[in-house]
């Protein structure tokens, strides 16, 4: 059994770790609330944009935008949003597993693939994973701006425009609630048709002054808005996962401290018993 002094040192070390994880839990909780507010503010716009674009994809247009054309999938692109930092449980691992499973399914069909990782963990993973990394972004912080993503997303859009990509997806952790964050893969291009009941009839819009100029701008903004929404959803998911992970670490540290305290008490009791025995033995000898 370890000595009482050694155990006491271990207890002090675990207590210091517990203070750190407890502080990180509180910081993550505060950041999560702010991230939820940003996510809630941008989600209605992203969902409305997705609905309108779904209707446009269902409509009969004189001008057929390239983003509406379904091509044979020879090359697939993924914009993968992960975190910049760790200590958030299995959030990134589960996301990467989902991407790899989807990549394997496309690979079985003979398609090639390339990636646009967003977040330091995503960049690190896909540079080691294999496959072309066409663009990347990291260090966006806790309050990213759309302008920070336009250049990175633009690289993938340019590849699609030039026929170098036939499918484009965005992958991120969708925030459901504090305890649940779900990795999702959403198709960006070609534009997915709306599955709402409202599309049972054909939707047609009047485009003024020119459908080409309007759609060229609108559809690019649509892709950018969906990627931005994925980023803010992932940040909220990250802070929620980190808060839960740090709470679990704090609780585990508390249990470990209790166990070590019992061991310390036994070691101290054994030491006292040993000292008493030595005193009694010494007295008997006299």
From Swiss-Prot:
<dbReference type="Pfam" id="PF00231">
    <property type="entry name" value="ATP-synt"/>
</dbReference>
<keyword id="KW-1003">Cell membrane</keyword>
<keyword id="KW-0472">Membrane</keyword>
<comment type="similarity">
    <text>Belongs to the ATPase gamma chain family.</text>
</comment>
<dbReference type="InterPro" id="IPR000131">
    <property type="entry name" value="ATP_synth_F1_gsu"/>
</dbReference>
<dbReference type="InterPro" id="IPR023632">
    <property type="entry name" value="ATP_synth_F1_gsu_CS"/>
</dbReference>
<dbReference type="GO" id="GO:0045259">
    <property type="term" value="C:proton-transporting ATP synthase complex"/>
</dbReference>
<dbReference type="InterPro" id="IPR035968">
    <property type="entry name" value="ATP_synth_F1_ATPase_gsu"/>
</dbReference>
<dbReference type="GO" id="GO:0005524">
    <property type="term" value="F:ATP binding"/>
</dbReference>
<keyword id="KW-0813">Transport</keyword>
<dbReference type="GO" id="GO:0046933">
    <property type="term" value="F:proton-transporting ATP synthase activity, rotational mechanism"/>
</dbReference>
<protein>
    <recommendedName>
        <fullName>ATP synthase gamma chain</fullName>
    </recommendedName>
</protein>
<keyword id="KW-0066">ATP synthesis</keyword>
<keyword id="KW-0997">Cell inner membrane</keyword>
<dbReference type="GO" id="GO:0042777">
    <property type="term" value="P:proton motive force-driven plasma membrane ATP synthesis"/>
</dbReference>
<comment type="subunit">
    <text>F-type ATPases have 2 components, CF(1) - the catalytic core - and CF(0) - the membrane proton channel. CF(1) has five subunits: alpha(3), beta(3), gamma(1), delta(1), epsilon(1). CF(0) has three main subunits: a, b and c.</text>
</comment>
<comment type="function">
    <text>Produces ATP from ADP in the presence of a proton gradient across the membrane. The gamma chain is believed to be important in regulating ATPase activity and the flow of protons through the CF(0) complex.</text>
</comment>
<keyword id="KW-0406">Ion transport</keyword>
<keyword id="KW-0375">Hydrogen ion transport</keyword>
<dbReference type="GO" id="GO:0005886">
    <property type="term" value="C:plasma membrane"/>
</dbReference>
<keyword id="KW-0139">CF(1)</keyword>
